[in-house]
Amino acid sequence: GVIIMIELKDDELVFEFPKVHKEAVCRIAFQRTLRIPDDNREYPLPPGLGRFPMAHVEDHSARLPASWAERGGVLLPMYQAEALWLNFDCGRGFGGGNYPFAVKIAAGKINAVTGDAWSNDLVKEPQDYIVVPDQPWLDGFSVGKGLIRQFVAMPLGRGYTAEEQITGAAEHGGIQFIVYPMKRECYEAMREDSLPDIAFNLCQSYEQSPALDSMGLAPGGLMRQEIYEDEYGFDVWDTDNSSRCFVHVLNSAQWTAATGGHTPGR
């Protein structure tokens, strides 16, 4: 079996694929921001308020539902007034190269890139994944070409969540990721060619809110964001070495009950 490591470091989710390549490291941070009211008015962009704290499910499994323990993953607390955006970073940092990944993201059982029901496989047409580091952040669900809705906390079982609206069921709250590294030989060939690839200058860490001109607001709690097309070609992704992680979103009372109020990583 392939050794794939998923760790929490400084409240970032870190996926490492050492058997694929020593530089095959993908980091996902969950950035706090304010929720934009969904009332058909335009609002200025909310600020970035730092990272959400996170904790491993297995560290608190005695206080969690059995189904969560089976699925594993991590916990994240979110207030009703908050929203989150995802920040992606790859490689070993400065001078370490920026290893490309295909990342599938589901909120509930809905694919955040396509807005369709979730499937476990990587799909080429229509592209149902983002490519990082080319796509340095994601602010929400795709709801149309260039338009997204914020990732916000909603109580399950009241018909509010994207999952319930599309599938009519409320089984899987939270956010699910499947991360696929580029195949080793494709990465090595790309490095040798030293193509002027946009991936190699886009992988800084965007800890601040993204630049205004790339995001603009549309009415009704919508924001503008393009999903970048896969410029590498579908066959470069190593589908034999994917890694999956489930992020359970709790409200503050649930978080305190599960973790004893302990804020990890501080």
What residues fall within each predicted segment?
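Intrinsically disordered, low-complexity segments enriched in small/polar residues
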Residues: 3-266
